Amino acid sequence: MNYDELKQIWAQKYDTVPQQLEKLKQIPAVATAFNTNIDAILKITGESLKKLITDNHITVDELTNIELSNFRKPTDVIIGIVKCFSRGIAEEWVTEDVNIYKWMETNLGYERLQMGGQGGIIANALALLGVNQVIAHTNSHPKIQAEQFLNLNNLMGIDENGESRKAYDISREQDIPLIHWIIEFDKGDSFQIDGKTFTCPKSNRFIATYDPLNMSLVINNGFINYLNTHPVQYLLLSGFHSLLESNSGVQLIKNAVPVLQRWKDNNPELLIHLEIASTQDKVVRKAIIDNIVPLVHSVGLNERETIDLLNILGQGALAERIEAETNSCNLFEAVLYLKKHLNVKRIQLHMFGLYMTIQDKDFIYTPEQNLKGMMTAAVVSSSKAYNGEIAKYDDVTKTLGMPVSNQGLNELTALSEMLHKKELLEAGVCEIDDFWLSAIPTILIEKPKTLVGMGDTISSVSLLAGR
């Protein structure tokens, strides 16, 4: 079967997306926690990056074979940008040094502000998609933060009195704004330093974070009390990734366990999803696996996060293989290992051009339902990339009807051939090792206007739309 025929088959499958979007409106309540902040967006070009490098006297040797993954001094911001730019990868580095924050404020600036943090981004998306009530955790909610929430009556936060109110209207003026820099770059852009050319192989972004409250996992007591007394159907978790061992990160994770356990005990029907996110501190990464993962039903991750988990679970050889060849076959092997090792009911990977989920046979959704959820997420996330934002309901289906990508079909074909599961290529579902595997080719935007919050949107919409 040729790609034109396969694209037609998948186009017919994607026709179910409007029905799945309607099902989201049947969900009574969802909570998102714990990280909400403000993102300062900056699109950087090769030329402007070159100017930063020369103005700060950084040598070409410092930009070659970069192994650094955290900040030591302010100009390491530039090193991090070049690392991600030249490899087409996404990383988030965090700092407790206010001087680095001030350097970024002075030397980078920003083009616009928007909602940041997995919790906040997911809350906006799900409220716009029509979930009846979305309650978002904020540990800082001044007016500038409130303005990043959509002005929707079904989108709630906790006010200064510990009461639930429309998130857009809350103004906890005693709170400090939490601002992260999102530095985006485009595939094919390049710059030259001392005769060496650096070319970006894939559109992506570098995130530089100074966020004392989220880095200390400050949890709003009003939010805790609200979920203790108001059951929700889904809890979408994130925010552990910015913790540091040096800042009591492991103990902060352990402190969150009884909070989560009480929510589970009070609400046996609660379904909890954890978004792994880019966790640079290896000790914290292990603590998340040991303490938080056992409490959740579903986990979401991307290629980089998959490699990071493998490295701390003694699977360095497989991690290196994926680093060398980041493809669906190697990643499937990794996700299957993680599914078995973490013993979580559902695990979803979003990679370039393809999403895949491995789930228990007794999971509350069938693999066919999960497939529909992933296709819905592919439309919503690609529409966000195409549009730059999702500010009104009509924005969520901008890419509906666009063909699935050749990249996605390449990956799905290779995976189905490796597994000797022809049905995976056309049906998107097969049985493997007593689990269900579902996989879809996605819609890719050649020059996305934004990549912020893509993984979060994919994971949350995939899960909730798979009804």
Model regions: which residues?
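Ribokinase/PfkB-type carbohydrate-kinase core domain
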Residues: 1-457, 462-467
